[in-house]
Amino acid sequence: MTTAAEAPRRRPSGRYAVRALGNWMNLSTPLGLLISRVGGCRVRRGPRRLWLAEGYRPAFPFARAFTVGNVLVGRGRWSPGDTRLLAHEERHSWQWLLCLGPAYLPLYTLAMAWSWLRTGDRASANVFERDAGLAAGGYPERPLRPLFGGGPVGGRRVSPPTTPRARSRSGR
């Protein structure tokens, strides 16, 4: 009987190799490594051909963690207990691949703007964050606001003026 230490290491499946190669070729992983270096991170190999960058210092972007290609960038240290957040960020690495690399940035920005318009925050209606799992990424799910006919952004209606002149024009 072989122990876990004696068992041969299993190589990650082919899909992870495809993702790693694709994100390297579309230049998103090199960009992620550059961002992590500029951000003062320590970088180490992670699971499933990912890179884990730890100790990101700049204030932007405003997130506990973010992903660029196959590089998962975190403000703190990645630990084995971060399974939900790791899975969330790993899903973003697949999104980088499907968006052909740097095209992800303007698409994500548009999705973030749409989410802010519809919910008042950047994640609740963001198709990329919803696909990666809102709760796993630490985002609350906010309700949708009306787009049209609900008054100003935020869905608040403005009451009509109540001066005597305004009432006389309305026929009341």
Q: How would you name each of these model-derived features?
A:
Residues 81, 97-98, 102:
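Membrane-helix interface segments
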Residues 60-67, 71-86:
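Short pre-active-site segment immediately N-terminal to the catalytic Zn-binding motif
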Residues 72, 92, 117-118:
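Residues at structural and domain junctions
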Residues 84-96, 132:
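Active-site recognition of the HExxH zinc-binding catalytic motif
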Residues 76, 94-95, 136:
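Activation segment
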